[in-house]
Amino acid sequence: MSNLEHITLEMDKVPLGDNKTLVRNTENISKHSYGGAIDGRTRNTLRVPRAVPETDDDDNDDRPFVKDGNDNPGVDDGLFSTVGGNGGNGGNVNVNVPNGGRRPSFSFPGYNGPGFVTINGVETPIPDVNAYQHKKTLAQGMMDLALLSANANQLRYVLETSSQHPYFYPSLLFISLSIIFQIAVGVGLILNGQYNIKNGHDICRANRINNYTVSGIFIVTVVNVLISAFTVDRDTVPALPANTT
């Protein structure tokens, strides 16, 4: 018996559980026979990629379908139009594309006339923008025009004072200017309330008159500050010299 045969017989007598190298080699060989791969350097089993059937992600898609007869899924259907203004995949979804591809603009609620809106189950009429804007402008203007009564009282007080007072004429001038500008502002507010802001020409005129009224209110405010600074007081009227002749 040769030495090689003797070594082979001795190795056959060794249990497999005591020789870890032999066990590992046996496992690698068995795995390789079933499709595994063995790294030549580390003798470890490599994972061999296998072709698996692809799953369609759209099978369990819970997005709504466009009701155009073709069951086009997704929320993007109809956003991009093809020839004829229809959505993708040959659907019959009509897409209204404005000029230049811009998003269509919607008017303010109530701008095109009075309508109705449901609030807590109750139909509430929407006020007309014209009437609302006019009432708001008139209310703001009338709050400023309330100063007219105070100026009228101040004018009466100055006229009852002697003209010898040093602030008599400045006070008379400022009070008169305040009253005149307040009357002009009131006329402008009344004219501004007559225009229809739905009309392009009327809204330009109303805007111009509104600018004039704002300027007039500013002038009235400045003039009344000057009136407060140059107040006429009867106690400070200089006494007339007595006639000694």
Curated annotation (Swiss-Prot):
Ranges for region Helix alpha2: 149-165
According to the UniProt entry, the coiled-coil residues are none
The record's statement on gene disruption is: No visible phenotype; flies are viable and fertile with no obvious developmental abnormalities.
Please give the biological process terms from Gene Ontology that the record holds: cell adhesion; cytolysis; killing of cells of another organism; programmed cell death; tissue regeneration
Q: Which residues are glycosylated?
A: N19, N28
Record protein name field: Ninjurin-A
Keyword list (alphabetical) reads: Cell adhesion, Cell membrane, Cytolysis, Glycoprotein, Membrane, Secreted, Transmembrane, Transmembrane helix
Task: Give the residue ranges for region: Helix alpha1.
Answer: 135-146
According to its UniProt entry, this protein's organism is Drosophila melanogaster
Q: Which lineage ranks, top first, belong to the organism behind this chain?
A: Eukaryota, Metazoa, Ecdysozoa, Arthropoda, Hexapoda
Q: Where is the composition biased (Low complexity)?
A: 92-101
- The residue spans the entry assigns to the Extracellular side of the membrane are as follows 1-170, 233-245
Expression induction per the record is: Up-regulated upon injury.
InterPro entries (UniProt xref): Ninjurin (IPR007007)
Which family, according to the similarity comment?
A: Belongs to the ninjurin family.
Region spans: Disordered: 32-101
- Gene Ontology annotations for the cellular component aspect, listed alphabetically: extracellular region; plasma membrane
